[in-house]
């Protein structure tokens, strides 16, 4: 504190009242180590913010060859809060949608009755906007100021560029090009018919052993989420997940779209989501589920049977199909018909629909995905 007052003339530290905020904590690992002493001292509250704090190797950044020893993390002396981009509900609040409207949507879901047309159309429009804008605070703020998608896109591309800069700045030298190659391959991975993450898509001849750590770095940085294939459609889901068979989704839909072809935003706002083999739809639902704290799973068999997502809903395993059109859900129907094999009794179809039911399949509009809590 003495040094801080020397560096900030006029600053007054009042025990029990002063809160010290340390931004960009990753730039100075020693500052994080100092939290132990602030906690022990007890006179001042300290809030720290920063990116990449979850990345393996934090505190071992090497600027010189002789700087090999990392700094210690003050275990037990800090409370960690993971901050995510705005989820869809928060985006609704920012756009003036009241809690009463959201409660009404909950009731429509609970009673399985259609949402009135005026509200339904408004929610559809807002969801399309959320797909394009995403939840990064600066992007949302820019959108709310003038609704200029061009300006929003520039903000998003700046953020993506900052991600790439961080990869160069904080990763080990040997990993830097591989991390960037992994990151830049994500749109190509999702544009494939089979969206399973394939290392050969990064670079011809690439092997998993070369890129496993690079992909983990991007995930630890909070940029992507993995969606694991299940060996069987039974609970517990995590116990049936294949660690080496997975899809990768961007954790912010707006940033994902900013990495795609120019004009994609206009297509989405006009309701045209057929491009990229349904990846835009899948990514936004993965985005929504991830921000709810859900782990992501899907089901794929070599026979061609595939379901976009599986989750625990109302205490049981539930299939979730995401449709860019009012298409067929052949795999879901096959699984539901063969309960003795797959042990599944319910499914949800998300798409450009209103609320409805067809036997064991609950049909919902895309914008209701955020209401699908586990119980």
Residue ranges and their predicted role:
Residues 13-31:
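Conserved P-loop NTPase "ATPase switch" module shared by AAA+ and STAND
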Residues 30, 326-336:
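Active-site-adjacent loop/helix micro-motif of nuclease/hydrolase catalytic cores
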Residues 319-327:
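Active-site ExK catalytic segment of metal-dependent nucleases
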């Amino acid at each position: 504190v003495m040094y801080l007052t020397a560096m900030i003339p006029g600053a007054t530290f009042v025990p029990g009242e002063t809160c010290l905020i340390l931004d960009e904590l990753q730039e100075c690992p020693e500052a994080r180590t100092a939290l132990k002493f602030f906690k022990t001292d007890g006179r001042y509250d300290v809030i720290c913010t920063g990116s990449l704090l979850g990345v393996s190797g934090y505190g071992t950044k090497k600027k010189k060859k002789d700087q090999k020893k990392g700094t210690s993390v003050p275990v037990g002396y800090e409370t960690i809060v993971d901050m995510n981009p705005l989820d869809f509900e928060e985006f609704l609040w920012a756009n003036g949608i009241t809690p009463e409207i959201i409660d009404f949507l909950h009731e429509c879901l609970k009673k399985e009755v259609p949402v009135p047309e005026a509200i339904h159309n408004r929610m559809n429009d807002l969801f399309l906007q959320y797909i394009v804008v995403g939840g990064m605070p600066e992007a949302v703020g820019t959108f709310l100021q003038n609704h200029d998608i061009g300006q929003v896109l520039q903000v998003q591309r700046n953020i993506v560029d900052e991600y790439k800069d961080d990869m160069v700045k904080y990763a080990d030298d040997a990993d830097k090009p591989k991390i960037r190659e992994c990151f830049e391959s994500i749109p190509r991975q999702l544009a494939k018919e089979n969206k399973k993450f394939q290392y050969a898509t990064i670079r011809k001849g690439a092997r998993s052993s070369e890129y496993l750590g690079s992909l983990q770095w991007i995930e630890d940085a909070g940029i992507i989420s993995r969606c694991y294939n299940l060996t069987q459609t039974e609970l517990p889901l995590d116990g049936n997940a294949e660690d080496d068979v997975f899809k990768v989704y961007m954790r912010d839909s707006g940033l994902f779209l900013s990495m795609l072809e120019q004009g994609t935003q206009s297509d989405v706002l006009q309701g045209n989501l057929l491009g990229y083999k349904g990846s835009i739809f899948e990514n936004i639902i993965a985005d929504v589920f991830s921000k709810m704290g859900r782990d992501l799973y899907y089901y794929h068999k070599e026979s061609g049977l595939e379901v976009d997502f599986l989750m625990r809903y109302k205490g049981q395993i539930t299939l979730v199909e995401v449709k860019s059109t009012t298409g067929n859900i052949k795999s879901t129907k096959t699984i539901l018909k063969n309960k003795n094999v797959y042990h599944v009794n319910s499914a949800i179809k998300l798409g450009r629909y209103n609320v409805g039911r067809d036997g064991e399949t609950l049909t919902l509009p895309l914008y209701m995905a955020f209401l699908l809590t586990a119980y």
